[in-house]
Amino acid sequence: MKESISLWQTGDPVPEPNRSQEQAISDLREFGYTIIEEALDADRLVAVRERLMEQADAEIEAGIAFEDQGADQNRSKQYDRLPVDTFTAANGGVNQRVWMLVNKGKVFRDLVTHLFMTPLIEFLLGPHFLLSTLSANIANPGGVEMGLHTDQWWMPRPMPRNEAPVTPGSIERGEYYGSGDVDPARLINPPCACNVMYCLNDFTALNGGTRLVPKSHLTGLQPPPDVPHTVSSIGMEAKAGSAILFEGRMWHGTGANRSNGPRLGLLATYCAPQFRAQENYTLGIDPEVRAEASPELLARLGFKLWNSYGRIGHPHARYVNEPTDPIGEMTPHGQRQATGHMLP
């Protein structure tokens, strides 16, 4: 009888919150996620939460807030096919996303290089990795449940030699590859991205904590995107200050907030260095932030070369700096003959 991998079912074992690197790595291997207690101490938690709410309120006041998860909004569509004003309260948006937090406070930037989380990210991605996005989700009451998805949907699946491969540039967000029992003999991709979700208030079943499908990282498949979900998932429950780390192959989605208050999550997404980040830091970073950034932060923002990739000139430079005098078209002072001698 052929062995198979069954999807997680409600009531099956799940990780317990912990403060152990060893336990966290074990959880990541088996379940695809782990919950770290007290990732933010009390003072840091208050500082991050207050700065986030101040920024969020200011963006609403300025008319630039990104508001989604309304009943008639569908973020699974290709973003470049949607009008720019799709995600606003006027168009039914309920939750508020705050993007590009790297520019919006030192308390946010400090999380990019979190000392406890870094070894766990390195376990998944290796010693070289990039920040893909640093953002927040303020999930308000009334927001609808998000369809399940993975955060490395852009990875082509391993293909048998006799099948035509999927061209990488044709892959679309929200493609459905199937579910159910999984043949363990079929090859799957490694994790190439991961998420650290910092809980800025308690995540509960009632307020729509992120929903995950434990062990789905081993399926090698994209999840069915239906809402309500057609597979068993679990809403994350964690105390304020905790961090939920889950890898990029995990099936997950924002839960619906049925409480009477907002749920505040700050999400740091990382990817391997050969992949394109969601946020373009080399172009979008505030010059003052860049000038003050540590070498470690600059590396995670994509300013450090990786095996000569990301260069703007010399392939053996370590970091790229904004060129004040970029080299453009040049001609020698003299004309060169075919023999290589200069004409007088």
Mark where each language-model region is.
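Short hydrophobic-aromatic micro-motifs
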Residues: 36, 198, 244-246
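Non-heme Fe(II)-dependent double-stranded beta-helix
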Residues: 1-30, 37-174
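Catalytic core of non-heme Fe(II) oxygenases with the double-stranded beta-helix
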Residues: 119-120, 144-237, 276-285
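Non-catalytic surface loops within mature trypsin-like serine protease
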Residues: 140, 200-202, 270-272
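Catalytic metal-binding/acid-base residues of hydrolase active sites
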Residues: 137, 151, 216, 250-251
